[in-house]
Amino acid sequence: MDPDDDLVLENEAEEIERLQLPEELKKPIDPEEEDERVARIEFNCSGCEMHEMVHYFGRKPPFALGVIYPEDNYVMRDPFQPPPPRWQSKPEYYIAMGTKCSICSKTVCKDPGCSFYYTASFCLPCGKEELKNWPPEAQARIRKQMSVSQGRQT
C-alpha cells in the first residue's frame, strides 16, 4: 500500500474550501483598528454636555498599573504624554473623566458643577435628593459645592 493512498479525497475542491480562512480573517488588518491608543468609547456628561472619546470604562484601567476605582469610571490616557515603549509595562498618565450616577445612571463628569462623591458618585440633582440621608459633614460639603458651582454659572 502506497502511503499517499490514504490522502485521496472524494471532493478535493470542497476540502480546500473547508481549510480556507473565513472571509473576515482574510481582510487586511487596519493599523488604526489595532491601535489600543485610539479612544473608542464615547463619553457625554449629562450635566455640562462635555463630549470626549475615552479609552476605557471600568474599575481597573490596564494602562494605569495598580489603580483600582471603587466604581466604574470613564478613563482616558493623557493625550499630552508620549506612549511608553510596548516592551515596558510602565504605568501611563491618565485622566478619570467621569462615571455614572449611582441612582439615575446618568453619565456625569468629575467637575464639581456636575457630580458629587460621597460613598458613591451622584449627579447634583440626585445628590440634592439624597442630601437629607447623609451626615452633617457631607451635607455641608455638597451645599458648599453647589453654591460654588451656581456662582460660576452666573
UniProtKB/Swiss-Prot annotation:
InterPro entries to which the protein is assigned, alphabetical? CDPF1, CDPF1_dom
**Pfam families, from UniProt?**
C6_DPF
Q: Which family does it belong to?
A: Belongs to the CDPF1 family.
Q: What is this protein called?
A: Cysteine-rich DPF motif domain-containing protein 1
The organism encoding this protein is Drosophila melanogaster (Fruit fly)
